[in-house]
Amino acid sequence: MDYSEIMVRHGELSTKGKNRMRFINKLKNNIQDVLAPFPAITVRSDRDRTHVSLNGTDYQPIVEALKLVFGVQALSPVYKLEKSVPLLVTAVQDIMTSLYRDGLTFKIATKRSDHAFELDSRELNSLLGGAVFEVLPNIQAQMKHPDVTLKVEIRDEAAYISYEEIKGAGGLPVGTSGKGMLMLSGGIDSPVAGYLALKRGLDIEVVHFASPPYTSPGALAKAQDLTRRLTRFGGNIQFIEVPFTEIQEEIKNKAPEAYLMTLTRRFMMRITDAIREQRKGLVIVNGESLGQVASQTLESMQAINAVTSTPIIRPVVTMDKLEIIEMAQAIDTFDISIQPFEDCCTIFAPDRPKTNPKLGNAEKYEERFDIDGLVQRAVSGIIVTEITPEIVNDEVENLIDALL
């Protein structure tokens, strides 16, 4: 027998009361986005489950994709069949025969939500267990901690049989907690911050600052590849490329070296906030970790934050670098993040950046700039690209190969 579908069990959605179906429908849409590379797949949801019909597709890559989607508590490959006792008997016998090995223990666990079905749960357990003994007389039943628990569900529309429960990613479906702008540089920390924001249901749009010719096409492709990795957790993500060359040249030419980083990040924050307002976001997300670099001291954060009253979420703020690296490796962004392309945060980095910049000094130096004009030109020049989970050639690897 081949699996018919993957049955998805919802996570925290069970606590959402009147909003439950909104959360479930969002999860369904996210699953459809993530499984877009598999055109034969169909997805439907009810209050208790989401059903991913395989329609002949190999189940293993579908399971691997679904394991990453936020809002999924657990999933099981299942056999779907008509609610017929003879069909159930045959299916149970075939499944257990395929799983059998010497010393294997099992139990039948039946749940009947269709109370019009001819047998109740106790009767089905007895009948189906007896059917297994008919074809496997040496198998042993074990009610506590068996090797195989064969789950049989009798629902209104069909019967379902499964024996494997796979842990999902948990969290909330992406998009159920509003929209935020993720400041993604291309380093290790910001993709991890994006992952953690996605886990709590935030629909992120990625803001990436590009400063050609100082930053290369490889840096841009790297940021887009990182964004594509994040789409595995909840579907398509809008990637917003911001032209930043003019601003960086202005800062380099007119500001003291010690304040280059502070002023650069204040401009980045202003621009991200303007894009957030334009695109109806609620928060800004970044990958700052307290004390990790000069721009991430409390004094620096205060001086940079002063340009906006928008809430700023820093998911990795209390994490050690090693913890962030381990999480980056776990979500498969680390190898991309360490590829050798400079981003706009590093191209004009001073040798000794100010670790305790004064807000008054930052504001005084900014009097040398046409702040509104610079921000407006940057925002008007953004390029928005929708990044999907579809499998594409790795642009960054191709660019690295060309350099070698």
UniProtKB/Swiss-Prot annotation:
Domain THUMP, chain residue ranges per copy: 60-165
PROSITE patterns per UniProt: THUMP
Organism, scientific name: Streptococcus pyogenes serotype M2 (strain MGAS10270)
GO biological process, one term: thiamine biosynthetic process
Catalyzed reactions per annotation: [ThiI sulfur-carrier protein]-S-sulfanyl-L-cysteine + a uridine in tRNA + 2 reduced [2Fe-2S]-[ferredoxin] + ATP + H(+) = [ThiI sulfur-carrier protein]-L-cysteine + a 4-thiouridine in tRNA + 2 oxidized [2Fe-2S]-[ferredoxin] + AMP + diphosphate; [ThiS sulfur-carrier protein]-C-terminal Gly-Gly-AMP + S-sulfanyl-L-cysteinyl-[cysteine desulfurase] + AH2 = [ThiS sulfur-carrier protein]-C-terminal-Gly-aminoethanethioate + L-cysteinyl-[cysteine desulfurase] + A + AMP + 2 H(+)
InterPro entries: Rossmann-like_a/b/a_fold, ThiI_AANH, ThiI_fer, ThiI_N, THUMP_dom, THUMP_ThiI, tRNA_STrfase, tRNA_sulfurtransferase_ThiI
Pathway(s): Cofactor biosynthesis; thiamine diphosphate biosynthesis
Protein name from the UniProt record: Probable tRNA sulfurtransferase
UniProt subcellular location: Cytoplasm
Gene that this polypeptide is encoded by: thiI
Top-level taxon: Bacteria
Pfam entry (one): ThiI_fer
Function in brief: Catalyzes the ATP-dependent transfer of a sulfur to tRNA to produce 4-thiouridine in position 8 of tRNAs, which functions as a near-UV photosensor. Also catalyzes the transfer of sulfur to the sulfur carrier protein ThiS, forming ThiS-thiocarboxylate. This is a step in the synthesis of thiazole, in the thiamine biosynthesis pathway. The sulfur is donated as persulfide by IscS.
Keyword set, alphabetical order: ATP-binding, Cytoplasm, Nucleotide-binding, RNA-binding, Thiamine biosynthesis, Transferase, tRNA-binding
Known EC number: 2.8.1.4
CC per GO annotation: cytosol
Protein family according to the UniProt entry: Belongs to the ThiI family.
